[in-house]
Amino acid sequence: MTKQELLKTHFGYDTFREGQEAVIDALLAGKDVLAVMPTGAGKSICYQVPALMMKGITLVISPLISLMKDQVRSLNQAGISAAYLNSSLTQGQYFTALRYAKAGRYPIIYVAPERLTTEAFLDFALSADIFMIAVDEAHCVSQWGQDFRPSYLKIAEFVAQLPKRPVIGAFTATATKEVREDIARLLNLRDPFCTTTEFDRENLYFAVKTPKDKYKEVHDYILEHPDDSGIIYCLTRKLVEEVCGKLIQDGITATRYHAGLSDEERRNNQDDFIYDRCHVMVATNAFGMGIDKSDVRYVIHYNMPKNMEGYYQEAGRAGRDGDPAECILLYSGKDVVTNQYLIERGQDNQEMDMETWRLVRDRDQERLKQMTFYCFTHDCLREYILKYFGEYGKSYCGNCLNCQTEFEEQDVTEEAQAMVQCVKESGQRYGVNVILDTLRGASTAKIRQYHMEENSFYSVCAKTPVYRLRQIFNYLVLEEYLSLTDDGYTIVKLTSTSRDLLEKGSMLTMKMPKAQELQKKEKKVRRRKSSTAGELKEQDEPLFQKLRALRTEIAREEKIPPYMVFSDKTLIHMCILKPENEAEMLDVTGVGRHKFEKYGKRFIDAVQNL
């Protein structure tokens, strides 16, 4: 079969996405490849198609067990024989899989990097006809990458032992220039074909918010989107437990994922999410790499991540089916402090000497600063992301909160000076909420406990809305007029430049959003409209729900996630085309020959018998 025929038969697509065909052609021509393609751009097809066209085995080196299982299950659903070799297999299962591999049963084999150096796998590899090695999540080889894994450094050594050097393809979703250079060098790529596809994901809506009550923001959002799947990312395990526990207590079916859970619990919780038994996943960044759930409609970051690379990779897990999805970041000053603490804790990594650790720490601090700037910019959020990765987009995308908000330059000198004076008079001993509650004249338990009613600046900003005070405070932290430290809990401190703000004649202005409350209401209307994916017409909604129910029924029968039957995008296209026969069903995006033979008649019957 040609590459186009393979694409349609097994994957159900009529055309390749941007960048895919050029990568496939390079690999088929025997050239090494370094491909940087954002999450959702279809990296896996770039090595799966050549693997099916060429004689020999393709080894896919992958860092996570969950990633391998998900990919192999998807391939098997598409009628492609594939297997994985990792620590989740019993000894008997492992050697059976190796025996089948030697017999040529699997054109594609996923393997953990730790397995490359084991005696049993080396014996297999030395006698096998390996056409290609695809290194997934290739940024893991670089100590400058956000997920450095020392086991990836063994890949080049493994390749050097093979009797015949295979073609090598390195794939990653996010990589700066330094990381790309590291990947090419550490994997010993030979004159590679390098490509970086456009990072922009036009279907994703970006927003940064600074709510006083993050949990309420998340809770209310989920209630507005009861049928949508979403991920809530938290910085720490403790927060994951806290947020997930509250959601369950409030009647929301949520589950959780972090490294502190047992393997079995993580596996069960992950399955609950991908099988749609549970719509909300609360997790640390340990969750998501390689999880091919295409219908995630929102990703909410409960905290600001450490860097833009991690943020864009995690946010990119929304809307992989191409339909509208939302990426919302909830910022607070404490997030900066927590991330600084996590960066400093990197010193505990025994695999790095002190000099290397310092270099990594300094780089991480710079990345954190760039991430913080993202949270404060009033320019287009999409443009900020693209610029960070070396691309230049429009200065107005129309699909982020900043582009949908009108800003104006406002004088905030009076409020800013009051904040600095309040911190100074109170002895630099309190957190953000105590300072802001003092300025607005609140009478909370802590205000009374600390006798803040006696502070000279108590209630001087009583007429200023609390959201505006919070925006001004965050701006003062960004401009380093105030700082936050972690002395058990977050404390507001003065800086060496605090005094400048108090000098006679000093003035501070900042961009502030206009008519904020009105925009909030408009945003909620926009959300509801975008939640029903794609071009679905109102009269087709009953058919769409019927097809989703059939998909769930089939998924339960076959014990697979619903999105592996057909994606929402495919079901929507069925609602539009309303196929009556095989030829018409094969015109539906995402329906290939193999899946038609398995499911086609049942879906045609469902369409015709509404």
Q: Which residues make up each language-model segment?
A:
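Short, charged low-complexity linear segments at domain edges
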Residues: 359-389
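Accessory DNA-binding and partner-docking regions appended to nucleic-acid-acting proteins
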Residues: 1-6, 337-338, 349-353, 363-365, ...
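Helicase motor core with emphasis on the C-terminal RecA-like subdomain
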Residues: 1-10, 14-18, 22-44, 51-54, ...
